[in-house]
Amino acid sequence: MTSLNKCIGMMDEGIERTIQLIPQLPAVEAKLSRLMLMVSGSLNEELELELKPHKLNHSEFLTLMFLYSRPDSSSTPGELCEFTKQGATNMTRIGNALVKRGLITRGSSVDDRRRVVIRMTPAGKRLVLKMVPPLFPRLEAMFSGFSDTDKKNLGRLLRKLAHNLDQATGHPETNLGTMKATK
């Protein structure tokens, strides 16, 4: 497999050639967009490899992590669809797979029996505690050489880009002033 850096070099060369054919191409923006897609794809591939021994895919992992992060380890199918960027049909499939493995349960809300609530089971919590800590060294290695300021700025800039994407795609509910930067 070709290294990510080699692919990035090929992308840079390709965009430079494309500028000759389409001079009005916003080259910096095109390079940044493609660079983010390439890095994102590589991150996703790495995560999928880490999840494979646990027989999970990325969407199932996101679902478990979202539930794990909730104060009561529960959510609704709609919230899960929104967070994981999955449609209702695929979220049903994800839920079925996780229920079958005993990692989550589906039930009615105590407040409204018509409302479905998805809860993480103790087995789901144990799986998260087993598989997440081994991811830490790789995560830290990816950001080696980044100062705390670099990481803070990257987070701020990505949030700013997310805000602009929301605005451009008709999802203006994001308020840039209230977005919190992470460490």
What are these regions (language model features)?
Residues M1-Q24, T149-K183:
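C-terminal regulatory/oligomerization modules of transcriptional regulators
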Residues N96-R156:
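Charged, amphipathic alpha-helical coiled-coil/dimerization segments
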Residues A27, L37, G41, E45-G87, ...:
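N-terminal helix-turn-helix DNA-binding core of bacterial DNA-binding proteins
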Residues A30-S33, L37, G41, K85, ...:
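Short amphipathic alpha-helical segments with heptad-repeat character
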Residues M1-H54:
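N-terminal leader segment of winged-helix/HTH proteins
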Residues P77, G95-N96:
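Short, hydrophobic-biased segments on the C-terminal half of alpha helices
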